[in-house]
Curated annotation (Swiss-Prot):
Compartments (UniProt record): Cytoplasm
Pathway it works in: Lipid metabolism; phospholipid metabolism
Gene Ontology cellular component list: cytoplasm
Family, similarity comment: Belongs to the PlsX family.
Subunit relationships: Homodimer. Probably interacts with PlsY.
Protein name stated in the entry: Phosphate acyltransferase
UniProt-listed Enzyme Commission number(s): 2.3.1.274
A GO MF term: phosphate:acyl-[acyl carrier protein] acyltransferase activity
Reactions that this protein is recorded to catalyse: a fatty acyl-[ACP] + phosphate = an acyl phosphate + holo-[ACP]
Length: 365
C-alpha cells in the first residue's frame, strides 16, 4: 500500500472521497494542497470537500484543474482539536467533520478522510455509520514500517479507545487479520499480542486471557498466532499484525514517529557539520534519500477506523500536504479494493467460525 504509486484508472473508476477540509492544525490550505497532490497522481478521483465554501473556492482556484474534480459543501462550523466528543455529538451537525461522515453514510462517497480531532471523529463515525454487527469497540489501525516484504506491519488499536478487555483484543485480532489480507494481500497473516515480554507468564491477566482466546480462534479464522510480541518486534518480520489497546498503541505510534524525525534531523546535522561530511552526503545522496523516504512518517499517514459500517481514514492533525496526499491515496486504494464490504463479510465469517471453535473446545474440556 505504497503512497507513492498512482492507481490505475480502471482501479479507481468513479471513486468519490469525502474530505474534511477544516480539520487539522494547518488548516484548509494544507488539505487543499494535499488534494492537488493526490489528484495529480490519480486524476480520475473525485472529491466532496466540506468546509467554508468561500475560503475553499479561493484555495482550490489556485490549483490548476482541481475545481473540476471537487464538489463543495458549505458548513459554518469546525470541530476544534480541543473539543470534547460529547459536545460535538450534541452540537456538531453543522461542522465540516459531521458533513464529511454524512456523505459516506448517504452513499455519496465511499471513504471519508479527516485530519481533525480523533475522539470527535470516532464519536461522529459511531453514531452516524454505526458499528458492524458483533463489534464491541471499533479500532484504529495504522501501517508501521517493517522488514516484511510488503514494507509494513499493521498495528491496532492506536487510539480509538484506551481500554480493551480480552474479548476486545480478540476482535482486534480478527479485524487486523482482515485488514492485512485486503490491504497487504496476505493470505494467512501472523498475529502478535503486544506485551512487556514474549514469555507466557508475563503481562496483565486480561492479556493472558486474550492470548488464549486468539490462539483458539486462529485455526478457524485462518491466521497464525505467534504469541506475545514486544516493542522491538514492531518493525520486525516476525509478525504481520500487532494487537494492543489504544493507549499503548498510541504511545508506541507517537514514539516511533518522534524517533524517525530525530534520526532524520541527526543525519542532516551530521552531514552538514564539515566540508568532508557535505561531500560524503553528496556521494551518498541516493541512499540517504531512500532511507529518508523509508522512515518518513508522512508516507504512512492515515489510520483506518475498523469495525464501522463505512470506511474512515484519520490523517494526523499536523499533516502537511504530503501527509494529506498519502491519507487520500490510502483512502482511494481502500475504496478501489472494495475494502469495507470485504472486511464486513470477513469479520462476520471469522466471528462465527471463531465462536464455534471456542465453544467446541470449551465443551471438550
Amino acid at each position: 500500500m505504497s503512497d507513492g504509486a498512482a492507481l490505475t484508472e480502471d482501479a479507481v473508476g468513479d471513486t468519490v472521497l469525502s474530505i474534511d477540509a477544516m480539520g487539522g492544525d494547518l488548516g484548509p490550505a494544507s488539505v487543499v494542497s494535499g488534494l492537488a497532490k493526490a489528484s495529480a497522481k490519480n486524476p480520475t478521483l473525485r472529491f466532496i470537500v466540506h468546509g467554508d465554501k468561500p475560503e475553499l473556492e479561493r484555495l482550490i482556484a489556485k490549483k490548476r484543474g482541481l475545481a473540476d474534480v471537487c464538489e463543495l459543501r458549505h458548513t459554518k462550523d469546525v470541530v476544534t482539536m480541543d473539543a470534547k466528543p460529547s459536545h460535538v455529538m450534541r452540537n456538531g451537525k453543522d461542522t465540516s467533520m459531521w458533513s464529511t461522515i454524512e456523505a459516506v453514510r448517504d452513499g455519496d462517497a465511499s471513504v471519508a478522510v479527516s485530519c481533525g480531532n480523533t475522539g470527535a471523529l470516532m464519536a461522529i463515525s459511531m453514531i452516524r455509520l454505526r458499528k458492524l454487527e458483533g463489534v464491541n469497540r471499533p479500532a484504529i489501525a495504522c501501517l508501521w514500517p517493517s522488514r516484511n516484504p510488503s514494507g509494513f506491519n499493521v498495528m491496532l488499536d492506536v487510539g480509538a479507545d484506551i481500554r480493551a478487555d480480552a474479548e476486545d483484543l480478540l476482535q482486534y485480532a480478527l479485524m487486523g487479520a482482515s485488514y492485512a489480507r485486503n490491504g497487504l494481500d496476505l493470505s494467512r497473516p501472523r498475529i502478535g499480542l503486544l506485551n512487556v515480554g514474549t514469555e507466557e507468564h508475563k503481562g496483565r491477566a486480561e492479556l493472558k486471557v486474550a492470548a488464549e482466546l486468539i490462539d483458539r480462534a486462529a485455526p478457524a479464522a485462518d491466521f497464525e498466532f505467534v504469541g506475545f510480541v514486544e516493542g522491538s518486534d514492531l518493525p520486525s518480520d516476525r509478525v504481520d499484525v500487532i494487537v494492543t489497546d489504544g493507549f499503548t498503541g498510541n504511545v508506541a505510534l507517537k514514539t516511533g514517529e518522534g524517533t524517525a524525525r530525530l534520526i532524520r534531523e541527526l543525519l542532516e546535522q551530521a552531514f552538514k557539520k564539515t566540508p568532508f561530511s557535505r561531500v560524503a552526503a553528496l556521494l551518498a545522496f541516493t541512499s540517504l534519500r531512500r532511507l529518508s523516504k523509508r522512515i518518513d512518517p508522512r508516507r504512512v499517514n492515515g489510520g483506518v477506523f475498523l469495525g464501522l459500517n463505512g470506511t474512515v481514514v484519520k490523517s494526523h492533525g499536523s499533516a502537511d500536504p504530503t501527509g494529506v496526499a498519502a491519507a487520500i491515496n490510502l483512502a482511494a486504494q481502500l475504496s478501489a479494493t472494495g475494502f469495507h464490504k470485504r472486511l464486513a463479510a470477513r469479520i462476520a465469517q471469522a466471528e462465527a467460525a471463531a465462536s464455534v471453535a471456542i465453544q467446541k473446545e470449551g465443551s471438550s474440556e
